[in-house]
Amino acid sequence: MKYLKFFFIFIIATTLGICAHFALPRTAPTKLPPSYAKSSVLLVPLDSRPVCSSLPQKLGQLAGLNVILPPKAYLDNYKTPANKEKILQWLQINKKYYPYSIISADMLLFGSLLEARQRIATPAEETALLGKLATLTKSQDEKPVTIFSVIPRLLVSDELLPDRWYAYQLLRYSEYHDLVRITGSFALTQKMRQTEKKIPPEVLQKYISQYQQSDRFNLGLLALAKKTPNTKLTFGQDDASPFGLPHASAQKIKAAIYSKKLQNKAQLTYGADEIVALLIARCFLQQADWQPKIYLAYASTQTEQSVMPYMATTTANALANQLALLGAQQVAAPENADIVCYINCGTDKNPPGKNQAQEVQKLLEAGYKVAIIDSSEDYEPQQLLLPQLLKYNVSINRLTAYAGWNTFSNSSGTALAQAVIFAARLRQLQQTGADSKEIIALYAQNLNFTLERILEDYYYQKTIHPALRQQLIAFGNDPTKLDETEKQAAQNYIQSKLALNAFTLLHTNLGRTPFYSDGSKEYYITSLAVSSSLPWNRVFEVDLDVWTSVGMK
């Protein structure tokens, strides 16, 4: 009986300890006003994936912009291309009603990014689309339009057979071809010819033709922009490297921009999926008539000049390019900045740790608006900054922005877009003497967006997705070709894991400190709910939403 008594005391003490560990501060529920759109943007997305459709819409909501997409029935669904004709008709009908349009040329030419990687458009198709775009922009020339087009990526599509069997040889050929173009080296020419012999002629010709077709069409877009005063262009260099046929295409576009004197109307950037986020942010900054000042803080001395996977340039060059696209200004000191952008490019040899976490916490405590770009060389969680922020109890609820998905440019473009939109919207509210509840609501709305990125970019992409993929393969299922039963089982698994992650995040970090204080009152996140689904019959991406409640103390 004596030992039983001590056992019950131990159980009760342990239970109380766990409850105390997960307990949140006591607060009074607070109802915040909803946000309303002040303007609208018409968007023809790159494809229907959430990062190209719902993410831009959520960024638009943060900016007070209603981002309007074509009907879902018109859009692509994984391997089924979009109904291009229906989308073009929708655009022709609706464009005149909205002040600004962002149009993916790849969607209108191919029906999706995936289709653009697998099919080569004919000259007749290009000419027809350019003609329709010319009519569209001329007939509504008082309404600004930005058209964006993506240069084919370096690696051949995994969906193409037998092409993907020669992916490595095609990559090497592409790099040698570009280096020979630049240097004229006889030795490199010999290596290029040796590599060429290892590739079937029809496979090589198809690969080269992709870039020839892209060059031809993009030069046509430049000619179109030359004739239409309110048409701007953005060209993206998708999944590339410092040398290769994509780099050669980018150089052709750059030369054409200068020769046609279109520097104020056309830009080249590094990436694809994040382009719309940057363009929406640029649109809002132009409406707000504001140029934000950005200070770039690197997690290590190696970060600035590192070339991350699938990037055609260094992190410093990529960031300078995106700041120019936004119309933002880089400054040399944090005290002169509206936003401090903290950049991690973790590697096995140089992972982030306690020092980096403390640097971020000091910036937050000093009152800076801190946006984090969290990238990793091998897409491994131990190379990311976020786990270190959680380990050392950094107040992640005070971050202005966070992104850590896929490539470096995907992450940097998303984080920069969120940060400048939030800072510009806050500035607007403060200048117009908005009610304090509106400012608190903006902070809460921005935190919602940040939490979606944390739950998706870190918890799903870096922890749940790899484990789920391995399980599917172990049971003989293809993670890229799920049937409906497999998809539902995968969704149930993902939802249960994300719900647990959200609960843990709320009770161990997010809800324990205020996300906003006005000097007399503090505001806390008191609940965090998450819902998720697979947009396509594969596990590569997830469609994710979060809901939070706010309490006042």
What are these regions (language model features)?
Residues 6-9, 195:
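Short amphipathic alpha-helical "recognition" segments used for binding
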